């Protein structure tokens, strides 16, 4: 998708770019597939900040996306490609043969009028979803499940793609976008193709206000705070940390491991930093 670069008519416009959205074919979302989305400004149910630098932003409705692809054997026609403010990828509106409508992530190359389907025995074609055991080696996939029936959890961002590299017993080895190679159960579903909107990574935000519209607040350096607010704060003028770097809560930062390994780490064949 082409990118529109603005002329530097103001300091904020300088170096700003936007997508042209030529792939979008429908502006208003399907009313039956949206629901209200309450803002939480990064707070949990106790009001404690769990995600920093969030708050404000434009009002959004949540689009209900079918990550499970569990309508097996029923063909669906792509009715529209739409914008989704809640994710970097575009979404495709499907009209199933039985009358149901659903949204899926729009893969690269999927067009209005295409026919997609899911389930065992579906053709190896962009937009179709199959169990990993039926997908040939070397095939590019996205929206990958980690547990059968749970719905896709991996490889969902714009331009993301994983590749099937091996099949051993009941597990399939996938090369993920990070370079990590990971075992996933062969009964897990995955969708053929690469997630669309490849040029998302080439867009330049250009100004702080545009980031505020997205719901992101400023990230303040610890050294600019007071010692009450951050271990790096205080001092006259610019001062060195005088200690190994710390998080705002006093934990070691910048390279120090502070978490236990997950039990699921045993499914990692090669870590991303070994690639």
Curated annotation (Swiss-Prot):
This is Large ribosomal subunit protein uL2. Keywords: Ribonucleoprotein, Ribosomal protein, RNA-binding, rRNA-binding. Part of the 50S ribosomal subunit. Forms a bridge to the 30S subunit in the 70S ribosome. Belongs to the universal ribosomal protein uL2 family. Residues 221-275 are annotated as: Disordered. PANTHER family: LARGE RIBOSOMAL SUBUNIT PROTEIN UL2M, RIBOSOMAL PROTEIN L2. GO terms for biological process: cytoplasmic translation.
């Amino acid at each position: 998708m082409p990118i529109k670069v603005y002329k530097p008519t103001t300091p904020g416009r300088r170096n700003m770019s936007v997508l042209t959205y030529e792939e979008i074919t429908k502006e208003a979302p399907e009313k039956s597939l949206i629901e209200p989305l309450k803002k939480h400004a990064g707070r949990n149910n106790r009001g404690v900040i769990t995600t920093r630098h969030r708050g404000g932003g434009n009002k959004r409705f949540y689009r209900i996306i079918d990550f499970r692809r569990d309508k097996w054997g029923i063909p669906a026609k792509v009715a529209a490609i739409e914008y989704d403010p809640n994710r970097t990828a575009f979404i495709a509106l499907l009209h199933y043969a039985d009358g149901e409508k659903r949204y899926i992530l729009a893969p690269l190359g999927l067009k209005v009028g295409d026919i997609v389907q899911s389930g065992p025995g579906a053709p190896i074609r962009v937009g179709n979803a199959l169990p990993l055991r039926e997908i040939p080696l070397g095939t590019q996939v996205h929206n990958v499940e980690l547990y059968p029936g749970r719905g896709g959890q991996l490889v969902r961002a714009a331009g993301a793609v994983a590749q099937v590299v091996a099949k051993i017993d009941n597990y399939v080895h996938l090369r993920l976008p990070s370079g990590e190679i990971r075992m996933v159960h062969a009964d897990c579903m995955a969708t053929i193709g690469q997630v669309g909107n490849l040029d998302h990574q080439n867009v330049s935000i250009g100004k702080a206000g545009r980031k505020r519209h997205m719901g992101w607040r400023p990230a303040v350096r610890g050294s600019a705070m007071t010692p009450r607010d951050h271990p790096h704060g205080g001092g006259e003028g610019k001062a060195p940390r005088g200690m190994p770097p710390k998080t705002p809560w006093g934990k070691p930062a910048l390279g120090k491991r502070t978490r236990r390994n997950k039990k699921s780490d045993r499914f990692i064949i090669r870590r991303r930093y070994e690639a």
